[in-house]
Amino acid sequence: MYFTFYNCSGLTTLDVSSFDTSSVIDMHSMFYNCSGVTTLDLSSFNTSSVVDMAYMFTSCFGLTTLDLSSFNTSSVATMAYMFYNCLGVTDIIGVDTFDIGGLNSTNDLDNFATGVTLPTARYDALLLAWEAQDPFDGMAPNFGSSTYTGGGAVAAARASLISRDSWTITDGGVA
């Protein structure tokens, strides 16, 4: 499904609910620059075989919320620029449950969510869950203007990603 809807900026609606994605391994740039689309129902997507989700939603300006709670990311090897420049997105449901164990290069999370502002509770949950996975060292994810809860377990998890895993995290700082 590599580049399936790439640069379809004129689309306003898109029904992908009947797509069989059970054998798909590449979703790179699938919805790249679908800037007019305001909602996407991806609840039927089977992503268990997907290896590449880089640039998948880049520049999807019209989206405000994405529900990816059904995504299985255990096989994914790159998520770089996945939500880059999704300036209207204010929540990515399920992102905090992503399995990032398959990421094994320092650039696999580059500019992951640059331009996005996740709710503090979602970003907190992401930091806690991803730190617990003991991820690949040296990554530099950008979480846009997302802010985290200062002090306690969340701040400790973020600090661990930076010190133990040598991550360079860009975000909006303490809420």
Language-model-detected regions and their locations in the chain:
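Negatively charged
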Residues: 1-175
